[in-house]
Amino acid sequence: VKQTKGELYDYLKAHDCLLFLNESNADLVDMARQREMNRIITYGQSDDANVRGEVIDCAPFLHFSWTDLSTTESKARTYEVESHLIGAYNIDNMLAAITIGLHFGVTPEQINHALESYVPANNRSQLEVTAKNKLIVDAYNANPSSMAAAIENFKLMNVEHKMAILGDMRELGEVSALEHQKLVDK
């Protein structure tokens, strides 16, 4: 995954393209620094991000605030979003969408409306309620980091009975079993 992202960064640098960078991800920040990327707009939960977000609550859906710090400080305004996504780990995806939307001239109000209206139906961060259970479905195209984030979120849920069912990570090939074991060992 890192190698492929590195190739993407190399392409962006070679073609003088803009990079939307998750400032909260040290690996991605290091890759950008190593390549001396010049055209960057950052987002994340760090104080250095151009678009900064903060989790307010996650019971069960992600509720967060965000601020566009790329505007002048006197014009910076904080907005709140109540999403239909499970897990604090989804804030990075939401902040990426916000950052790209702002770059292309979408208003904060339009962005918030879109984020609050989005209800996942693609096996990502879905809450399914049955007669006896609540199921969190987060199964589409899992990888070690996304699965670890989902498990951490699952651990934080304050419920009497819970069970996790982990699917395959077939794209990992021969190391799939090892990566599953690492998750179980945590």
Stretches with model-predicted labels:
Residues 1-134, 159-160, 185:
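Acidic, Mg2+-coordinating active-site environments of NTP-dependent enzymes
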